[in-house]
């Protein structure tokens, strides 16, 4: 028990070290591919071909690396949200609605994140990381929802049983037996049927002292009680039946040897028939290439002078183009200066015209005259009013003086 415990601890430590190496090693970037493949396997366990793909023609089968990289954002986002909604419904939330193609992506992602949080899925990223429809976060959400769905439907992973390891001695013995069987006559056309189980070879070695063997089996192993004559008779009886029949295997090269020979003969025959045509064709192609090469040489010799002229013309055109560019720079600067001066002249013209209009216009004088005449009229009106007031005051004064004088006379 202590040795088993030490082995388990050693294995756990090696697994921990191996996981650390994987996380820090160069294979870290390929881990997302493995996670996507695991997602596809989980979807197949959930039978998504009959459940998800039959919801509509817009849902397509998911490839094993579909969500690794973002290629078609709109299609991947719609498929991600739809698959996440289906997994949420599959995990027990039947009231969850499937998203539509024209729904608000922010609200759709918020609903998916809320449903994942309700199922105990811890997320350390925002919903904006899922808008691309692909990547590590998308695969994490889908994997977590797929795990929750598998738990809800009651799926359980079976423990892997490793194959038994054979000892080297056993492998050597089997190899020796195979070598010995090669010397035995093969009958590939005579195959054993299921009914041949009745003809099982039974070796009955009669020996004395069976009771003694049952009581003391180790003693029977150390000392043989078999008679040589009985052994020889049993060998003569069983020897004719010791014939090995090999079942026909489609992968055995011996079965395809005849077919390979016939195909080889057919290929040789076809090569013999097609060979002359190929030789003639190669000769014709060689002649055509020679004619093309000679024609090319003659054209080059004929057009050598024209090509030299063309090169000189090209050089001249390049020089003229450079000169034109240099002149264009000066013209453009002068054009800008001319435009600026023209704007200044236009402003001066406008100022001169405004000043002339002000000096030649008699409207202010007319306004002044009208104002003076109006003032004169108002002055006359005020003079009349002043005279009326003075008259009324004088009348009042005279009346009061007259009354005062009359009162004095009456008193006296």
Swiss-Prot record:
- Where in the cell does this protein reside? Cytoplasm, Cytoskeleton, Cilium axoneme
Which keywords, in A-to-Z order, does the entry hold? Answer: Cell projection, Cilium, Coiled coil, Cytoplasm, Cytoskeleton
Bias-annotated ranges (Acidic residues): 165-193
What induces its synthesis?
Regulated by the RFX-type transcription factor daf-19.
Coiled-coil stretches are 302-393
The cellular component terms of Gene Ontology attached to this UniProt record, alphabetical and capped at eight, are:
axoneme; ciliary basal body; ciliary transition zone; cilium; Golgi apparatus; intraciliary transport particle B; microtubule organizing center
Principal localisation: cytoplasm
Q: Where is the stretch described as Disordered?
A: 1-21, 162-193
Q: Which InterPro entries match?
A: Intra-flagellar_transport_57
Give the GO biological process terms: chemosensory behavior; cilium assembly; intraciliary anterograde transport; intraciliary retrograde transport; intraciliary transport; non-motile cilium assembly; protein localization
Q: Where is the signal peptide?
A: none
Q: What family does the database annotate?
A: Belongs to the IFT57 family.
Subunit structure comment from the entry: Component of the IFT complex B composed of at least che-2, che-13, dyf-1, dyf-3, dyf-6, dyf-11, dyf-13, ift-20, ift-74, ift-81, ifta-2, osm-1, osm-5 and osm-6.
What is its biological role? Component of the intraflagellar transport (IFT) complex B required for transport of proteins in the motile cilium. May be required for ciliary entrance and transport of specific ciliary cargo proteins such as che-3 which are related to motility. Required for the formation of chemosensory cilia that detect chemosensory cues.
Q: Protein name, please?
A: Intraflagellar transport protein che-13
């Amino acid at each position: 028990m202590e040795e088993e415990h030490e082995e388990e601890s050693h294995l756990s430590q090696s697994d921990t070290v191996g996981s650390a190496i994987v996380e820090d090693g160069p294979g870290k970037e390929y881990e997302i591919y493995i996670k996507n493949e695991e997602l596809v396997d989980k979807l197949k366990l959930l039978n998504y071909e009959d459940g998800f793909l039959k919801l509509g023609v817009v849902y397509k089968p998911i490839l094993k690396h579909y969500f690794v990289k973002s290629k078609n954002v709109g299609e991947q986002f719609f498929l991600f949200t739809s698959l996440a909604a289906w997994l949420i419904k599959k995990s027990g939330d039947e009231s969850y609605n499937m998203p539509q193609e024209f729904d608000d992506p922010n609200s759709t992602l918020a609903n998916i994140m809320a449903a994942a949080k309700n199922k105990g899925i811890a997320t350390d990223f925002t919903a904006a990381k899922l808008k691309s429809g692909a990547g590590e976060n998308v695969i994490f959400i889908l994997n977590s929802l797929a795990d929750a769905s598998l738990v809800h439907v009651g799926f359980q992973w079976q423990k892997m049983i490793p194959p038994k390891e054979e000892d080297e001695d056993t492998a050597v013995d089997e190899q020796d037996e195979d070598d010995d069987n090669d010397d035995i006559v093969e009958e590939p056309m005579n195959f054993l049927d299921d009914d041949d189980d009745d003809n099982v070879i039974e070796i009955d070695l009669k020996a004395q002292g069976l009771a003694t063997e049952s009581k003391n089996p180790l003693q029977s192993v150390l000392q043989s009680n078999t008679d040589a004559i009985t052994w020889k008779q049993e060998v003569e009886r069983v020897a004719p039946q010791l014939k090995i029949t090999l079942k026909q295997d489609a992968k055995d090269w011996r079965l395809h040897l005849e077919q390979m020979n016939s195909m080889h003969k057919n290929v040789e025959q076809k090569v013999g028939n097609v060979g002359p045509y190929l030789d003639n064709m190669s000769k014709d192609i060689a002649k055509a290439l020679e004619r093309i090469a000679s024609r090319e040489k003659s054209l080059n010799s004929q057009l050598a002078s024209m090509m030299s002229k063309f090169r000189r013309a090209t050089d001249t055109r390049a020089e003229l183009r450079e000169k034109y560019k240099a002149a264009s720079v000066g013209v453009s600067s002068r054009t800008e200066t001319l435009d600026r001066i023209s704007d200044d002249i236009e402003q001066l013209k406008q100022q001169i015209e405004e000043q002339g209009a002000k000096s030649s216009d008699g409207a202010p004088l007319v306004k002044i005259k009208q104002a003076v005449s109006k003032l004169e009229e108002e002055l006359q009106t005020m003079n009349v009013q002043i005279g009326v007031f003075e008259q009324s005051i004088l009348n009042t004064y005279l009346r009061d003086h007259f009354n005062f004088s009359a009162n004095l006379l009456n008193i006296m």
